[in-house]
A protein has these predicted regions:
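Rossmann-like NAD(P)(H) cofactor-binding subdomain of soluble oxidoreductases
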Residues: 12, 16-19, 45-125, 142
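Short gly/ser/thr-rich secondary-structure transition/capping motifs
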Residues: 37-43, 111-112, 155-156
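Conserved active-site and cofactor/substrate-binding residues in soluble primary-metabolism enzymes
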Residues: 10, 14, 18, 62, ...
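Internal alpha-helical scaffold of NAD(P)-dependent oxidoreductase catalytic cores
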Residues: 63, 74, 98-108, 126-213
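NAD(P)-dependent Rossmann-like dehydrogenase/reductase catalytic/cofactor-binding core
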Residues: 4, 176-177, 205-301
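NAD(P)+-binding Rossmann beta1-loop-alpha1 motif at the extreme N-terminus of oxidoreductases
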Residues: 1-51, 70
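Alpha-helix C-terminal capping/helix-to-coil transition sites in glycosyltransferase folds
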Residues: 50-51, 168, 220
Length: 301
C-alpha cells in the first residue's frame, strides 16, 4: 500500500483554508504561514519542503520569487509546485514566469485558475478550474487529489493564456462594479461582458496565448464570477470608484494596471475599455460621463 501524498500549503488565507478543506481528509498536510499565530500547528519551510510531493502556493504573487528561491534547493525532483496567484509581481511577471526562472529546470510546476470562490468551496459547493502545465503528468496528479471533491479541473497546455486571462479579469471586473453602482442597467452589463471578453482575448493573443483560451474557465468563467458576485473584492472596488472614493483602492486589478503601465507590457491604446478603467482607477472622478464617452467612442456617435 502506497503512503498518502504529502502536501505543503503555503499561506493560510482564504484559498489556503479552501485547499485545506478539500484535502485534509485524504492527505498528509503541512501548512506554512509567514506570520503564524500560536493556535495552529504550522510547519517550517526548512522541515517540510524536502518531504513534500506537492507544494500549493496559496499566496499573492509578490512573495512567490522569494519563497521559490528558498525552497528550490530543498525540493524533491518530482515535487510539483502549483500556484493559484492571479496577479503580477513588482517586476511585472506572472507566477508561471517566476516558477520558470526560479525553480530547477526539470522541476514540474502548474497553475490552477478558474471560478473558485473560497467561501463556496468551504461550504461544499462546486468549483471549477483549469490546470495549466507543460505535460499531463501534473494534471493527473492534481486530478487524483481533487477527484473526491467538488473542485472539478480540466487541463490546458496554454500556461501563458490562462495566466493573462485570470490576471486581466480582475481589471475588467471593476467595470461591472462601476456600472452596477451607477445603475446603468442590465443591458450595459451584457455589453460589458462582450467588450471585456473581446479585449481580453486580443491581449491574451498579443501576450502569446491561444485564441480560444479566454473563452474557458480561467477567462470567461472567472470573469463572470468575479464581475457579478456581490462578494467579489473587485466588484466592490468598482462600486467604490463609481462613488468617487479614493481610499483603499487596492487589489490585484489596480496593481495589474500599475505594473502594465510601469513596465510597458502592453500597448493600451488598442483597448478602450482597459484605458477607461485605468483612467478611473488613477482618478475616480466623473465616472458616469466617462462611460458615456466610452460608449460614443465605440459606436462613433
Amino acid at each position: 500500500m502506497t503512503s498518502p501524498l504529502q502536501i505543503l500549503i503555503l499561506g493560510h488565507g482564504e484559498m489556503g483554508h479552501a485547499m485545506e478543506f478539500l484535502l485534509k481528509d485524504r492527505y498528509e498536510l503541512g501548512i506554512w504561514e509567514k506570520f503564524p499565530s500560536n493556535d495552529y500547528p504550522y510547519v517550517t519551510l526548512e522541515d517540510s519542503a524536502a518531504h513534500a510531493d506537492i507544494v500549493l502556493f496559496c499566496l499573492p504573487v509578490n512573495p512567490h520569487r522569494e519563497v521559490a528561491q528558498f525552497i528550490a534547493p530543498l525540493l524533491k525532483k518530482t515535487c510539483l509546485c502549483v500556484s493559484i496567484a492571479k496577479g503580477l509581481d513588482e517586476s511585472g511577471q506572472t507566477a508561471a514566469q517566476i516558477f520558470a526562472e526560479n525553480l530547477p529546470v526539470q522541476q514540474p510546476y502548474a497553475l490552477l485558475y478558474g471560478p473558485m470562490i473560497s467561501e463556496e468551496i468551504r461550504t461544499g459547493r462546486h468549483a471549477f478550474a483549469q490546470l495549466g502545465s507543460q505535460d499531463t503528468a501534473a494534471f493527473d496528479v492534481m486530478q487524483t487529489c481533487f477527484n473526491h471533491t467538488r473542485l472539478h479541473i480540466e487541463h490546458t497546455f496554454d500556461i501563458t493564456g490562462i495566466s493573462w486571462s485570470v490576471i486581466l479579469k480582475n481589471v475588467y471586473a471593476m467595470a461591472f462594479g462601476m456600472a452596477d453602482e451607477l445603475k446603468l442597467g442590465d443591458n450595459v452589463r451584457g455589453f460589458l461582458a462582450v467588450a471585456a471578453l473581446h479585449e481580453l482575448s486580443q491581449i491574451v493573443q498579443a501576450m502569446g496565448g491561444k485564441t480560444d483560451t479566454p473563452y474557458h474557465l480561467a477567462g470567461l468563467g472567472d470573469l463572470i464570477t468575479t464581475a457579478t458576485s456581490e462578494s467579489s473584492h473587485h466588484h466592490e472596488l468598482g462600486r467604490k470608484l463609481a462613488r468617487e472614493e479614493c481610499n483603499d483602492i487596492s487589489g490585484e486589478g489596480p496593481h495589474t494596471l500599475e505594473m502594465i503601465h510601469q513596465h510597458r507590457l502592453l500597448n493600451t491604446q488598442k483597448y478602450p475599455l482597459f484605458q477607461m478603467i485605468h483612467a478611473i482607477v488613477q482618478n475616480p472622478r466623473d465616472v458616469r460621463p466617462q462611460f458615456e464617452t466610452y460608449f460614443k467612442q465605440i459606436y462613433r456617435q
